[in-house]
Amino acid sequence: MRGHLYMRRWKYLVAFLLLIPGIVSTLRAETSASFSKTPPNFKVAFIGDQGLGENAEAVLNLVRSEGAQAVLHQGDFDYENNPDAWNAQINEILGEDFPYFASVGNHDVEKWNGKDGYQQYLKNRLNRLDVEWDGDYGVKSSLQYKGIFIIQVSPGDLGSFHADYLREQLAKNRSIWRICCWHKNMRLMQVSKKADDTGWDVYEEARKGGAIIATAHDHSYGRTHLMDSFEYQTVASQSNTIVITEGRTFAFFSGLGGKSIYGQELSGPWWAKIYTKTQGAHYGALFGVFNVDGVPNAATFYFKNIKGEVVDRFDVISRVHTGSAVEQHRSSQ
């Protein structure tokens, strides 16, 4: 156990050294500003495919007990076209001012718009938090929260030109941490019964921009290795410490929010972890902890189920917009 702790500290020290100017004097001022926006050990929960009732409530209680400071919900809310009940469930457990960011799923489309629709409830929450966003929220939108750049699109559900929007938004933002969120998948980016719904272009634009890809739709959990190409399923590294760059990233689906659990139908060497009914899965959430111990470009992720079991754990280091010190480090190798 002590050895594992030392190894993790060593990884974070290496990540930190990549950021030190002069190693130190040439870090960009804008990058330093971005660093300061993410509090140390800032925890985000990633969920999807939720529903109403006991299972969904258990996952939200897990989010609360783990000390998550924000939720990213990748679509499919209550499955009953009842925005008021869905919002009330969140408020009852997490509170009406909890940072809860959600993108539209296929089961949310019918009641998405309007003054009593899902989108309006989500906008009201953002307004209470004084969080500004660009675009059509939850459909084709972006926002900055605690130094993390979040893009939410809806390929296969609502709107169009989502890949173009991802490319444009990623090109003009200089955050270390960027997350591209949507609900549906390509068939080979899930392991159950879902079809090719999104097109590869959204995956590839997110990869080129060095963004983590967060999806759901498959009612199970899985994550890829570090990828050079999603379209051709090309693995760049199988290390459990994932080093993100512009052109290399990973994707996951986290759809165990409470509705149901699917069995596994597909597999492939690009998967680092698969957790479905076939593996005896329980409902749960993926948690990402950013700025680990004050190292701005270090994060650690773990998937925990409502039984208290951690079924996946991995570290992530971002080399996206971490400043010229990274280039100095590379040139010295």
Where are the model-predicted features located?
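Extended active-site neighborhood of metal-dependent phosphoesterases/phosphodiesterases
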Residues: R64, P83-R178, D197-V202, I212, ...
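Short acidic, glycine-rich surface-loop motifs adjacent to enzyme active sites
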Residues: N173-V191
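Bacterial N-terminal signal peptides
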Residues: V14-G22
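N-terminal active-site segment of His-dependent metallophosphoesterases
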Residues: L27-A88, G156
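Outer-membrane beta-barrel translocator/channel fold
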Residues: M189-G199
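Bacterial N-terminal signal peptides that target proteins for export
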Residues: G3-V14
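Active-site glycine-centered loops adjacent to acidic/histidine catalytic or metal-binding residues
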Residues: D49, G75-D76, G105-N106, H183, ...
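A short C-terminal boundary segment appended to hydrolase-like catalytic domains
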Residues: I261-Q333
